[in-house]
Each structure stands twice: as C-alpha cells, then as structure tokens.
From Swiss-Prot:
Keywords on record: Apoplast, Cell wall, Cell wall biogenesis/degradation, Fruit ripening, Glycoprotein, Secreted, Signal
GO annotation (BP), single: cell wall organization
Native source organism of the sequence: Solanum lycopersicum
Induction, as annotated: Transiently repressed by ethylene.
Name assigned to this protein: Polygalacturonase-1 non-catalytic subunit beta
Subcellular location: Secreted, Extracellular space, Apoplast; Secreted, Cell wall
The protein's assembly and partners: Interacts with polygalacturonase-2 (isoenzymes PG2A and PG2B) to form heterodimers called polygalacturonase-1 (PG1).
Residue ranges the record assigns to the propeptide: 28-108, 398-630
C-alpha cells in the first residue's frame, strides 16, 4: 500500500528552484531539460517566433549555450562587471564551451642539448642547447603537433653552440595556431642546422619566426618547409642568415600550396660575408596569396645568391619584392623565376642589384602584369620578360569553348552547375566538414552585454586575454571588420551572436513561416557521389533565402545574409557504387552572379564570368540556409 503525500504548491516551486539540474519535460522528443537554462529559453523562443509546427531544427537548437541554470544566473550577473569576468575567463570559457587561448607564463627552464625531446606542447620554451660546448647533435623532434588552438613560444634554440642542430616538426597540422619562434642557431661557429617542418598543414595560423642562423660562422643551414599547405591566416619570418661569415644557407620551401595566406619575409642573408645562399621556392601554387618579401642579400660581401622561384603558378593575389642584392660588393646573383602566375595578380619588384659594386646579376624569367621599378642596367641580364600573356601562362590554361577547365586551385565539386542536380548524376563532393573549433552560442542576455565593435577591440582583448599581435586579437579584429563591412549590392547582412538574433534576422527578411536547413552530415566528402531524388524548395522557383556561415570568434558567431534570386534544393546523396543513400544534402544555386568578381573561385572552376552563368554549392557542415516554408 502506497501513501500519497500532498505538498503545497509553494513547496513544489521551492523544490524546483533549489534543484537546477532537475529535468522538466517541456514537450516533444528531444526537448527534455531544465526550462531555466539557455537551451530551454531558446526552445520557447522558437515556438513563440516561428508560426508553423514543422519539426524543430535540433542542429540549430543544440548550439545553445550548455550553461546550467545556476551558471546562467552567475555569469549573467558577472558579465555586468567585465573586470570580474576577465578574472574568471577560463572557467567561463570551459562552462560555456567557448574558444579561449591558454594563458602561458614565461618558463625559466633550461635544457641542455643532451636531452632529446620527442614531443612538447602548450608551454613557453625559453632555452634549449644554448652555449653547449663540443661536438654533438641537438635534437628536437616534435613541438605542438596536431593541436587545437595551441599557443606556444619557443625562445631560444642552440644559440652560441658549435653543435649540429636538428628540429623536425613545429606546430604542424594545428588548428587556429598562435606560434612564435624567437631564435634558432644564432651566433654559432661551425656546425650545421636543419629545420625540417614548421607549421605545415595548419588552419588559420598566426606565425612569427624572428631569427634563424643569424651571425653564424661557417657551417651549413637548411630550412626545408615553412607553412606548406596552410589555410588562411598570417605568417611572418623576420631574419634568416643575417651577418653570417662564410655560412651557407638554403631555404627550400616557404608558403607553398597555400590558400588565402598573408606572408611577410623581412630579411634573408643581409650583410653576409661570402657563403652561398639559396632560396628554392616562395609562394608556389598559392590561391589568392598576399606575399611580401622585403630584403634579400642586401649589403653582402662577395655573395653567391640564388632565388629559384617566387609566386610561380599562383592564382591572383598581390605580391611585393622590395630589394634583391642591394649594395652588394661583387659576387653573383641569379633569380630564375618571378611571378609566372596562372591567373594574374599584382606583382611589384622594387629594386634589383641597385648600389652594388660590380655584381654579376642574371634574371631569367619575369612574369606578366608586374612592375619593376629599379635595377642595375649595366650589370643585370634579363633572359625573358613577359609583357603580355606568357606561353608558360597559356600552357597552364586549357581553353575549351572559351571555358577554363583547369581548376586546381578550387576543390572539385565546391561549385557546380544547376543541371548537375538531377537524379543519377555522378559528381565530386568537396570536403564539407567544419574545420572550426567547436563552440556554442552565448545566451543573448550575456552576449548583449559584451563589446562588439572594432572601436572596442582594446576592451575585448582585455576580456579574452588577447596579447598584441596574437591569434585571438587577429581573430576578433577580422570578424568585427567583416561584420562592419558595407553589404554588397542587393545583399542584406547581419552578424548574429546568439541563436535568438539569428531567428530574428531570418524572420525579419522572410516572415515567421520559415524553415532552416543544413546538409545532414559529412558523408560523401572528398569523393564521388551520386545524386538521388531531388526536391526544389518553394517549387524550385527563384526565391530569396537567408544563408548563415560560421565566423571564427571566441563564441559562436554567424555571418547571415539574404541574397536575392536563388533556388534552393534538397537532394539525397547516394554511394555511386552501391546506390545506397549516405547523406541528405542542401544546395543553393545563385541565379544572378553579375556582382561577383571575375577571379571568383566559381569562375576559375567552371569557366565563364560574372552574370553569365548560375553557380551552385552545397551547404557545409554547421552552415545553414533559411527559406519560406512550403
């Protein structure tokens, strides 16, 4: 026999508020949770603002802040005092699922070269193998490999030591990395140095390398790979082989095969005495690179300088080379290939061999659309200068019916024509996986109290512990600048830093009877797929939609914009061999491309030009598109 206990309503309410983790069903599958959490509030807000009863978009609602009710109340109060919030930043970031870089304090550790490190990460490394005497090898194998949001500083490696120095891998395969390397093999006498791999395959890197093999005597130094196949971000290399005496240096590859990288190399082999210097490849095969090389071999005495390739086969972008072997005394300088672009960019070469004392200078190939401001006319020899479209350029472009079909800078399947969206079509699918760090929205009440303007970057740096020239500072500045950019012709845009703001923007453009869609998952990425059944949204008619794309920021931030004259489709994605459904994709086709730039990746991949063709693309993981409900 069970005894029924009757409690007054006020006692029940008291119990509810005293148990923040108490589960209360607020209706429907997947809606179980505390209604006083940010997610509970978002679910209620969706019901209030959206006028239809279609299934809820859990891929959006699950991006709500994971704060529980007690944490929500605490941080809502704390954010009113930003000084108090910044003292508890890392607890806040952990609880709210934000992206915050670690605070690294300077390390006073010193390690001799007899210690051979295999792996090392997430610390400032002050001193390795400095002033080590005698013969031997300093070996450092892996530093900060494959990390997510790593912040590392390596201050000094092998300074003043005659030993051979080897550094295998530094910050490769990292995501949103902030790395600085201060000094490598400086002031050494004899010995050889080899740095194999620095920040290869990094996504959105912020790289600073201050000094490599400066003031060395004799010896051979080799830097093999610097930031190869990196995506977005910026990199800076300040000095290589400066003030060397009879030292030989070789830099094999810098910033090759990159996508939208900003690259600055300040000084290579300045005021070196004798020795052979060789730079094999800089910025080869880049997509929209911004390359700046300030000074190569200036003030050298009897140097032998060779620069093999600069910006060869790159796609648009801008490049500057300021000085090459300026004020050199005798010696020989050879520059083999500059600016042989696939698609023309802007190339400026300021001075070559100026002020030199009887240098022997050869310049082999200089590309199209370049500006050469000053060179030594008496001693410089130009083998080949292209002032029109070059044969090399033409050989890289296959033209078929006026269409460029060489699309090696654009991933296969990233852009396609509308006619491809038919059942039975086999086509490549790009990598639609989300590469950004996982984050959640902030609750609207908290996000609204944080600064959100380029004029408030100093305050944001303080809140998020962002140092000067750090990745976090750059990330915040880039995001806010894009948010404040004037809209393109016909575009309505807004950056939304809460799910509620996204709902408000979408409904302000499309009305309250809306549906938000995304591609179901990432299956089929990087391979061939077969198109199954296809459904045109709004009857397949030209309509308008709101698309929202992630932006890199400490908390989840979306750039949402309404683009007129589009058609939106849903399509089953099949395995091309088994014909089994593996995914359900959402694609958007832009009918009017007249305002797009002629160098847009879609035209590189598909041919034609602005306003001449429609262009379609898939909605990538964690991006989404809104449309009026059918």
């Amino acid at each position: 026999m069970h005894t029924k206990i009757h409690l007054p309503p006020c006692i029940l309410l008291l119990l509810l508020f005293s148990l923040p983790s108490f589960n209360v069903v607020v209706g429907g599958d997947g809606e179980s949770g505390n209604p006083f959490t940010p997610k509970g509030y978002l679910i209620r807000y969706w019901k209030k603002q959206i006028s239809n009863d279609l299934p809820k978009p859990w891929f959006l609602l699950n991006k709500a802040s994971p704060l529980n009710a007690a944490q929500y109340a605490t941080y809502t109060k704390l954010v009113a005092d930003q000084n108090a919030l910044t003292t508890q930043l890392h607890t806040f970031c952990s609880s709210a699922n934000l992206m915050c870089a670690p605070d690294l304090s300077p390390s006073l550790e010193k390690h001799s070269g007899d210690i051979h490190f295999a792996t090392y990460s997430d610390k400032n490394f002050t001193n390795y193998g400095t002033n080590e005497p005698g013969i031997g090898v300093n070996t450092f194998k892996n530093y900060s490999e494959g990390e997510n949001i790593p912040v590392n500083s390596f201050r000094r490696y092998g300074r003043g030591s005659p030993r051979d120095n080897k550094f295998d891998n530094y910050a490769s395969d990292g995501n949103v990395i902030d790395q600085s390397f201060n000094s490598y093999s400086t002031s050494t006498a004899g010995g050889s140095g080899k740095f194999t791999n620095y920040a290869a395959n990094a996504n959105d890197p912020n790289l600073h390398f201050t000094s490599y093999s400066d003031q060395g005597t004799g010896g051979v130094q080799k830097f093999t790979i610097y930031s190869q196949e990196a995506n977005a971000g910026d990199q800076y290399f300040k000095s290589y082989g400066k003030n060397g005496n009879g030292a030989n240096g070789e830099f094999v590859s810098y910033g090759n095969d990159t996508n939208v990288i900003g690259s600055t190399f300040t000084n290579y082999g300045q005021t070196a005495n004798g020795g052979d210097q060789k730079f094999t490849s800089y910025g080869f095969n880049g997509n929209v690179p911004e390359n700046h090389f300030t000074n190569y071999g200036a003030g050298g005495n009897g140097p032998s300088e060779t620069f093999n390739s600069y910006r060869d086969q790159s796609n648009v972008g801008d490049d500057t080379f300021t000085t090459y072997v300026k004020d050199a005394n005798g010696g020989e300088a050879n520059f083999t290939n500059y600016g042989q672009s696939f698609n023309e960019g802007t190339d400026v070469f300021t001075t070559y061999g100026k002020g030199g004392n009887d240098p022997h200078i050869n310049f082999k190939t200089y590309g199209v659309n370049n500006t050469f401001k000053d060179y030594v006319k008496d001693t410089a020899t130009f083998s080949n200068y292209h002032n029109k479209t070059s044969q090399v350029l033409a050989s890289l472009m296959e033209v078929n019916g006026g269409k460029k079909v060489n699309n090696r800078w654009v991933e296969p399947g990233k852009f396609f024509r509308e006619k491809m969206l038919k059942s039975g079509t086999i086509m490549p699918m790009p990598d639609i996986k989300d590469k950004m760090p996982k984050r959640s929205f902030l609750p609207r009440v908290i996000a609204s109290k944080l600064p959100f303007s380029t004029s408030k970057i100093a305050e944001l740096k303080k809140i998020f512990h962002a140092g000067d020239e750090s990745q976090v500072e750059k990330m915040i500045g880039d995001a806010l600048s894009e948010c404040e950019r004037a809209p393109s012709a016909g575009e309505t845009k807004r950056c939304v830093n809460s799910a509620e703001d996204m709902i408000d923007f979408a409904t302000s453009v499309l009305g309250r009877n809306v549906v938000v869609r995304t591609t179901e998952d990432t299956k089929g990425s990087n391979g061939n797929i077969m198109i199954g059944s296809v459904k045109g949204i709004n009857g397949g008619k030209v309509t308008k939609s709101v698309s929202c794309h992630q932006t890199l920021y400490p908390y989840l931030l979306y750039y949402c914009h309404s683009v007129p004259k589009v058609r939106v489709y849903e399509a089953d994605i099949l395995d091309p061999n088994s014909k089994v459904k593996i995914n359900h994709g959402v694609a958007i086709c832009h009918v009017d491309t007249s305002s797009w730039g002629p160098s847009h990746g879609a035209f590189v991949a598909l041919g034609s030009g602005p306003g001449k063709i429609e262009v379609c693309h898939w909605i990538f993981e964690n991006d989404m598109t809104w449309a009026i409900a059918d």
